[in-house]
Amino acid sequence: ARNRCVEDVYEPGSTFKPVTALAGLRAGLIRPADTFYDDGIYEVSGCGDSESCFFQNADAEGTGSVNLQSSLTLSSDWYYYWIGDNLWAERERLGDDFLQQTATEFGFTADTGIDLASEREGFAFTPAQVRQLNEDYPEDFPYGDWTTGNTINMSIGQGDLGVTPLQLTNAYAAIANGGTLF
């Protein structure tokens, strides 16, 4: 029988938002009490008027004024789009894989070490890995250039990111226990 807990990799979606929040805190982009106004539609800074310059919450509904705590409670995609956009904008200072490094610290890119057969590693692709995948497998990975949109998607747990249910459980256990990843 298939053990989906360790053999299957899924996009974590909004359950990834605490990882993005920590990256934003560490980068100095946000403080817990900083408030932003979430009107439901996020416009990528300096992007223009293209359709790819806009990201929206579910149903394009805004959550109003949000800080770190309420952004998690209300699951404001807008708040995390802003963090992702600014992590990418600050890539010269932070590196172009700052969010992925934070995901790695939570154990998302390695197996957990549990003694179960067929455990898979999750992934949080970096710009360099996406370029390499494009070079090696151009039909499967036709886009080799990382953009702001890749980081924005990853900031809400979508896109170039996959985790096993056990990895996600371990990450949340580390949050709950003060930071120890087992």
Q: Where would I find each of the regions flagged by the language model?
A:
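Beta-lactam-recognizing serine transpeptidase/beta-lactamase-like catalytic domain environment
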Residues: 1-14, 19-182
